[in-house]
Amino acid sequence: MRIQADFSLDFPRAYGTLEASADFRTVPEDFQVTENLGFEPAGEGEHVYLWIEKRGENTAWVAEQLAVYAGVKPTDIGYAGRKDRHAITRQWFSVYLPLKSNHPEPEWQGFSSDRIQVLRVARHVRKLRRGEHESNHFVIGLRQLQCADKTAFHERLDCVLRSGVPNYFGEQRFGNAGRNLIEAESLLVGKKPYRDRQKRGLILSAARSYLFNQVLADRVRKGDWQISVAGEPCAYPSGPLWGRGRPLALVELLARETELLSSWRDWCNELEHVGTSQERRALLLAIKTPSYRWLVGDHLELAFTLEAGAFATSVLRELVSLNNQQLRLSGTESSD
């Protein structure tokens, strides 16, 4: 059985050694996330859509409170992605409330509080499901940013925003100090049973994510993470999300990935019989609508948009060493 020391989360950076540091998330305003569904609610249907801004609360807790307030089952609540607790976030929730039912529609503004604000109400024809949104827009504050060479930092910043970064799963996917990976070892190798389906799903997701990061880390070390290689099954450079069925990579790339993950063969074998099907994930994370500005003192504000499922911390880790590592304990991802 593997132990905690076997699970390194120090994945290689594409742009070399960090020469800058900054304070991060000293206040919730330093991390703001706005969800983009990619479609507008239809204006009619059996599901009420609520555009909610939350501060200092996690998505699952808000969903639970919303079910209680609306008097519906927890399964009647939908949302596209978990958003960070230590932030100001705006996202959609759906509530199953057919117009013809005997269940009266609540006064939604009554759900608002000092930490939760209902900003918009609409109706739609279907429940909002996980991963259904298109992207997230981030506004991030980095305070007390220190760098030996500001010109070099600006060059690195411009290069990162223009060229993109390795599409690593963020450390928060793996739990505090990689705890989810220890749980994955117990589940996949030790055959520990998990009755909590949600917890089991999180553990399996962490395992798949860690194997993907191993493959991406190898591509970063070899310098070919931005280009397609022989055997690539997608129209873009990709890595495996292990699961049911046969691997999707073709002969050359499959041999390379299989060899790289040979020490994780026990995990791969188990993942082929549980959870979701084999998938591929892009190795390159493109950064859309990037901008930045310097505020008072050494306070840098970054703004950019990432596709669903991407991590803002994958961008930040290529720029600065973050003094406040509270982000490791919470989800800053777009769609999980």
From Swiss-Prot:
<dbReference type="InterPro" id="IPR011760">
    <property type="entry name" value="PsdUridine_synth_TruD_insert"/>
</dbReference>
<dbReference type="Pfam" id="PF01142">
    <property type="entry name" value="TruD"/>
</dbReference>
<dbReference type="InterPro" id="IPR020119">
    <property type="entry name" value="PsdUridine_synth_TruD_CS"/>
</dbReference>
<dbReference type="GO" id="GO:0160150">
    <property type="term" value="F:tRNA pseudouridine(13) synthase activity"/>
</dbReference>
<dbReference type="InterPro" id="IPR042214">
    <property type="entry name" value="TruD_catalytic"/>
</dbReference>
<dbReference type="GO" id="GO:0005829">
    <property type="term" value="C:cytosol"/>
</dbReference>
<protein>
    <recommendedName>
        <fullName>tRNA pseudouridine synthase D</fullName>
        <ecNumber>5.4.99.27</ecNumber>
    </recommendedName>
</protein>
<comment type="similarity">
    <text>Belongs to the pseudouridine synthase TruD family.</text>
</comment>
<keyword id="KW-0819">tRNA processing</keyword>
<dbReference type="InterPro" id="IPR020103">
    <property type="entry name" value="PsdUridine_synth_cat_dom_sf"/>
</dbReference>
<keyword id="KW-0413">Isomerase</keyword>
<dbReference type="InterPro" id="IPR050170">
    <property type="entry name" value="TruD_pseudoU_synthase"/>
</dbReference>
<comment type="function">
    <text>Responsible for synthesis of pseudouridine from uracil-13 in transfer RNAs.</text>
</comment>
<dbReference type="InterPro" id="IPR001656">
    <property type="entry name" value="PsdUridine_synth_TruD"/>
</dbReference>
<dbReference type="GO" id="GO:0003723">
    <property type="term" value="F:RNA binding"/>
</dbReference>
<dbReference type="GO" id="GO:0031119">
    <property type="term" value="P:tRNA pseudouridine synthesis"/>
</dbReference>
<feature type="domain" description="TRUD">
    <location>
        <begin position="164"/>
        <end position="298"/>
    </location>
</feature>
<feature type="active site" description="Nucleophile">
    <location>
        <position position="84"/>
    </location>
</feature>
